[in-house]
Amino acid sequence: MAQNDHETVDMLLVGAGIMSATLAVLLKELDPNLKMEVVELQESGAIESSNPWNNAGTGHAGLCELNYTPQSADGSIDIKKAVGINTMFEVSKQFWSHLVAKGTFGSPKTFINPVPHLSFVRGSEGIAYLKKRFESLTKHHAFETMVYSEDKATLAEWMPLMMPGRPADEAIAATRVEGGTDVNFGALTNQLLQHLAQQPGAQIRYNQKVTHLRRADNGWRVTVKDTRNGGDREIQARFVFLGAGGGALPLLQLSGIPEGKGFGGFPVSGQWLRCDNPEIVKQHQAKVYSQAEVGSPPMSVPHLDTRVVDGKKSLLFGPYAGFSTKFLRHGSFLDLPLSVRPGNILPMLSVARDNMDLTRYLIGQVMQSPEQRLEALRKFYPEARAEDWRLEVAGQRVQIIKKDPKKGGILQFGTELVAAHDGSIAALLGASPGASVTVSIMLGLIERCFPEQARSPEWSAKLKEIFPAREKELESDAELYRSVSSRCSEVLELTAKNDVQAPVNAE
């Protein structure tokens, strides 16, 4: 390739999942003149973690996920994380409603549907915790619509599939928020990509593998291989975003930026039990989360979810965790060993030493029999029959391993944005709550990598138009929260009666 034989873009985004799609469309909203390209290794968008069947949980808003509200040593409930995730999800809703209102999408029902969110516990300790959680959360305006019950008749209305077959004296309780949602991030991603592809100066190319990243005078020189015809090309980009899910870590290492030194990855795979039997599916219209078993990691929180994909309802139960050395579902078994570097070997060994309980848990999950999986399901749905459910492999998650001055290395659950000091390249690492808070994460990236533009009158005005209220305002101003949330729910058709709604009585 000749010295000058390269393409030039303002923005190069690696990975055609929800993160890159959101960032690209958001940047185009802020500056329509930007020239950008999205490159994706697979043959289409949203193949990996953004795919609805690979996504461990959707519509995360802190309403039902008990691991977001830990109990402190003094017995109090810490609601900070739940409030933070709730307001971030509201920011996502603002972006989606902005795009719906301007006609970017068709019906919002193609990607978001109303599904109540419930927390469900068994036993006196679980009930005491849930009641205290309810009392703590409902003091905040973001959770004021939450209701609590221990009444079996009420619970049968909320969870008609889950109540028959339980012992009459079983101590159970639940909270319910009617305004929860289910989000098909695969459909949302592909609609964002379709919209982006129609914009001047934007293109999306599939079957593209990034093989080299190196600094250039004005940004980065990136070598991309076409996996179908084998040809290489070079792209000169002022800014590069590595939004390739589990594949972001190897690309970050390839960049060589000092900010990426010391990071490692711990891959965790997932499996689900899936039910498509309409007679069963119609009896459950909810996402019901419970507590993880004592000593189990956060990704093990069991839940029984209504999923709406392409207009059809299914039920998913799990997740059952597993272990694979792949960083992507369509990745290589060499991903983990090839990610070991002199700079991250100590953190990775430290995590291996300090997380033997997690290792044992994952081995136990891998060794589970079908009967053991069914037994876990029956804690939610006592009358479950094996023939109505099938086991499906879900997507890969790569949890973050990072340096720690005391322990050498720690395993971090969540997401982390890693950016070069000059803002010319950024990578998103980690997993949950992931997709549900994509918009907030990408806004954070814009403020970090494009600080001057973000403060400019043009970008500031556009951001205020798209986002009438950001996270801190939503957290502190109850009236603003109510008005913005209500308007977004109306635009996204979350307040009207949904055609996928199931009956709630127990008969």
Swiss-Prot record:
EC numbers: 1.1.5.4
Pfam families: Mqo
Top EC group: oxidoreductase
GO cellular component, one term: cytoplasm
Membrane-spanning intervals of the chain: none
Catalytic reactions on record: (S)-malate + a quinone = a quinol + oxaloacetate
Lineage top rank: taxon: Bacteria
Alphabetically ordered keywords of this record: FAD, Flavoprotein, Oxidoreductase, Tricarboxylic acid cycle
Keyword NAD attached: no
Cofactor(s) listed: FAD
Molecular-function annotations in GO: L-malate dehydrogenase (quinone) activity
SS bonds (residue pairs): none
GO terms for biological process, alphabetical: tricarboxylic acid cycle
Pathway named in the protein's UniProt entry: Carbohydrate metabolism; tricarboxylic acid cycle; oxaloacetate from (S)-malate (quinone route): step 1/1
InterPro entries with a match to the protein in the record: FAD/NAD-bd_sf, MQO
NCBIfam families recorded: mal_quin_oxido, PRK05257.1-1, PRK05257.1-4, PRK05257.2-1, PRK05257.2-4, PRK05257.3-2, PRK05257.3-4, PRK13339.1
Family: Belongs to the MQO family.
Name under which the protein is recorded: Probable malate:quinone oxidoreductase 2
Record organism: Pseudomonas aeruginosa (strain ATCC 15692 / DSM 22644 / CIP 104116 / JCM 14847 / LMG 12228 / 1C / PRS 101 / PAO1)
Lineage: Bacteria, Pseudomonadati, Pseudomonadota, Gammaproteobacteria, Pseudomonadales
